[in-house]
Amino acid sequence: MNTLMFFYTLAILVICIVTAVLSLATYASSRRRFFIYGSGVFICYAIEMTEIFFFEYTLQNQSFPASDYYSITMPVLRTLVATASQAFIWLIAMDLLDKHSKKLFVIPIATFLLSELLIIVAIPYGPMHQWLYYTMRQVFLVFVGLYIFWTAHKSTKVELKARVNNQKKHLIIGAILVGCIVAEDFYNILVVPM
């Protein structure tokens, strides 16, 4: 089973890197910023996977408490990478909505970063601390999805409504996946910790 998980993780890492490179190549030919932002998301995910992979490798053949399985190792790096990843996702949403305000970009990202830092500093370490830390990402993604739909609903621009409507299926699938991640984290971290 360990060998299977090793190759699974390695495959995900390779897919992230290849997708990031392909996104950059697509940007080079199309000049659509969307592809730069998408590449950024995949690069951030690859960095995070590498950090997890490294942590698991260094603890190989060493016993550690089951409660540490979802521990927040290297919280500064992890928080900065998560914030960068969320920033790229937010840039994709802003690009979809044709929004270009620096203030609109900074406020949600700063709020996410401050929320993560507050959880690290203010919540006592334990399962609830871990669950809140990881769930903030899903909370941010829910915010992004709701903001997209709210902006499209409120808009009088037919083109914007059509653009968002074209992405409706992807946004719904994303919302379902976010719900699954929250349920999985809730179950694995709070209900039956390893």
Residues covered by each model-derived region:
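Transmembrane helix-loop junctions in multipass membrane proteins, especially transporters and channels
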Residues: 28-31, 57-64, 94-100, 124-128, ...
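Hydrophobic alpha-helical transmembrane segments of multi-pass membrane proteins
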Residues: 9-63, 74-87, 109-121, 171-193
